[in-house]
Amino acid sequence: MSRKFCVGGNWKMNGDQKSIAEIAKTLSSAALDPNTEVVIGCPAIYLMYARNLLPCELGLAGQNAYKVAKGAFTGEISPAMLKDIGADWVILGHSERRAIFGESDALIAEKAEHALAEGLKVIACIGETLEEREAGKTNEVVARQMCAYAQKIKDWKNVVVAYEPVWAIGTGKTATPDQAQEVHAFLRQWLSDNISKEVSASLRIQYGGSVTAANAKELAKKPDIDGFLVGGASLKPEFVDIINARQ
């Protein structure tokens, strides 16, 4: 089964109107691979601004959302609000949400369940720390994180999983294409054993750990890598080369 390549750009807490206009201009004028789905994860307050400037075929994602539709949750944003201003995706479970904001596997899974029920597509992030990798616990950690999602997600068609080795985020360290493929292959097998062979064959698994124009082409050749979740490089013109890594 062929899985459509999917590249997400996670701008994190970066950007202002001027820089977003510049990025939008770069993406609008570039020849982007029509066989690659592109999703931009923009700071929530700029989502509507970005939607008006970005090419309409690009998806737009919130970087977080809460597990209920509305209520007394100061500072939080709901999937319904994201949809209302033009987002069609949300990134959930990013390692920074887990590490800095203390989000648990269970909370992230509840967020994913609610976002899907509200009609958003979800980029569901997983990944291990350097300490966990060096202790040989990579598979154990990503299986635990997937297990939490699986308890809440019954229909996977609007889900993309992003494997981000935390030790390779913003550190300049990158998992080699072989290291990345090894974990992606494990995840594919886990899906086959624990969800279904159909989901294993169709679910897209992105790689997200210091992806650059320099390493994207090699990573994109791997059979179980179906795209990227790109951090810092998605704010730069080289993001176009990453989107076109399969060409």
UniProtKB/Swiss-Prot annotation:
Cellular component per GO, a single term: cytosol
Keywords: Gluconeogenesis, Glycolysis, Isomerase
Signal peptide start-end: none
Pathway entry: Carbohydrate biosynthesis; gluconeogenesis; Carbohydrate degradation; glycolysis; D-glyceraldehyde 3-phosphate from glycerone phosphate: step 1/1
Enzyme Commission number(s) of this protein: 5.3.1.1
One annotated GO molecular function: triose-phosphate isomerase activity
Catalysed reaction, written as an equation: D-glyceraldehyde 3-phosphate = dihydroxyacetone phosphate
GO terms under biological process: gluconeogenesis; glyceraldehyde-3-phosphate biosynthetic process; glyceraldehyde-3-phosphate metabolic process; glycerol catabolic process; glycolytic process
Residues reported to bind substrate: 10, 12
Annotated catalytic residues: 94, 164
Gene3D superfamilies: Aldolase class I (3.20.20.70)
Xref: NCBIfam families: tim
Family in the record: Belongs to the triosephosphate isomerase family.
Binding partners and assembly: Homodimer.
Record's protein name: Triosephosphate isomerase
Native source species: Drosophila simulans
